Amino acid sequence: NAGLRYDKHNFIGKEGEKRITGLGFSTTAGDTIFAARGGLVTEVVDNSASTSENTSFHSTENYLEVFHKDGTFARYKLFQNEGIFVSPGEEVIPGQPLGIIGGENYKQGSHLRFSIYCPDRPDHSYVPDFYLSPEETGKPEERVMYKSWHPVEIIMKEMSKKEKKKFLSKE
């Protein structure tokens, strides 16, 4: 379990409207990032980490993308160079290690940039409700510290019988 601080990443679109395009989670450099959901790894960029100091955004960032069975994609950004453990075409399960986070050269320090999007939406953006605690779901509040937790029943929710058996054999 890790303490995560949620920060909205806004994008200024047409006519100045703002929309949430992702979530930022404070991390410690070198932390392992785990899959939020299972799916197919569709894209990996593993050698483009920014070396600019004290930056807020950079056009080159290491990331990976996972396609989910419901048609959504998750994008995980700011991995260390050569720090991603998975490859395109690989199936991942919830809770599987994906890679080592970087981003310590950013103004906000090391952090994960996480977004979920739907290609069939006009603006592609989508921020789902999260399990904020074992008793509560909803949208996280900006700059509030949340503790991550990974209950087995949630991790296994989308798994096939074969994946569940494999997962439980590691427990």
Which role does the model predict for each range below?
Residues 43, 78-81, 103, 118:
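A residue-level detector for short acidic-glycine micro-motifs
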Residues 64, 93-106, 114:
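Short hydrophobic beta/alpha edge segments that flank linear recognition/processing sites
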Residues 1-61, 94, 146, 150-171:
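Surface-exposed, glycine-biased beta-strand/turn segments
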Residues 28, 34-35, 70-95:
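Short histidine-centered loop motifs in beta-beta connectors
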Residues 17-20, 68, 78, 111-113:
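Histidine-centered active-site/metal-ligand motif
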Residues 58-72:
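OB-fold (S1/OB) nucleic-acid-binding surfaces
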Residues 84-96, 111, 115-171:
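Acidic, glycine-rich catalytic/binding loops that coordinate metals and/or anionic ligands
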